[in-house]
Amino acid sequence: MAETLKEDSIMIREVWDYNLVEEFALIREIVDKFSYIAMDTEFPGVVLKPVATFKYNNDLNYRTLKENVDLLKLIQVGLTFSDENGNLPTCGTDKFCIWQFNFREFNIGEDIYASESIELLRQCGIDFKKNIEKGIDVVRFGELMMSSGIVLNDAISWVTFHGGYDFGYLVKLLTCKELPLKQADFFKLLYVYFPTVYDIKHLMTFCNGLFGGLNRLAELMGVERVGICHQAGSDSLLTLGSFRKLKERYFPGSTEKYTGVLYGLGVEDGTTTTVAN
């Protein structure tokens, strides 16, 4: 079970340009059996705030997300796969496998970033020079993602924590375009690529007394971290474990009615933009 995994039982598969094709080949082999995917991204923080005024917070939240995602560049994506019982793939090894994809686009010497975010990532072991030299091209990643079976697939359930920015970067990567101006158009794209989405932060609003970030939730749920905080692979595994514990404790029945909502988004000009799955 994902929530009882220990450090020595996990292999974080570091993915660079040289092994990207091989790792996606492994993912294609497991995706039918391991159809829950917990996802986390690392990016250069939030640097822009819209100058316009908005009547509704969700409109402000989306515009802030759009302007930052359009401008900034992805650093890491972490993916943890599990089956419906929380079991993780081993991919022919004696360890459970999760994936951490490292991208080349962000250049700390040339690109805009939030200083505190980059310093935190550096302290957590991200080597920005290595990413430039050996990292993945985002366009190539998007092409392989499209043919991998993990997107455009009704059988896959995606799990994030406060996942607006995570999905914003993936939608930008998959479309090779800036995010739509209208939030409703963003959600239309989201549901094409990711038909079933869970945002743990949204689920927590139905759990009396639960608040705060992923680390706090994991601690409350008794889920131990494996790997380094603020690296996408480790965070995606912690997301999966927390999701499973939350479901067991607070949602004993079906959770389908909670899909399709990203925390802080989903209302435009006072009208709901999300749709039932």
Curated annotation (Swiss-Prot):
A divalent metal cation binds at residues 40, 42, 166, 235. Keywords: Cytoplasm, Exonuclease, Hydrolase, Metal-binding, Nuclease, Nucleus, RNA-binding, Transcription, Transcription regulation. Its main location: nucleus. It is found in: Nucleus; Cytoplasm. GO terms for cellular component: CCR4-NOT complex; cytoplasm; nucleus. Its cofactor is a divalent metal cation. Its EC number is 3.1.13.4. The keyword Transcription regulation applies. It catalyses: Exonucleolytic cleavage of poly(A) to 5'-AMP. One of its GO terms (molecular function) is RNA binding. InterPro entries: CNOT7/CNOT8/Pop2 (IPR039637), RNase_CAF1 (IPR006941), RNaseH-like_sf (IPR012337), RNaseH_sf (IPR036397). Component of the CCR4-NOT complex, at least composed of CRR4 and CAF1 proteins. Ubiquitous transcription factor required for a diverse set of processes. It is a component of the CCR4 complex involved in the control of gene expression. Belongs to the CAF1 family. This is Probable CCR4-associated factor 1 homolog 10. It comes from Arabidopsis thaliana.
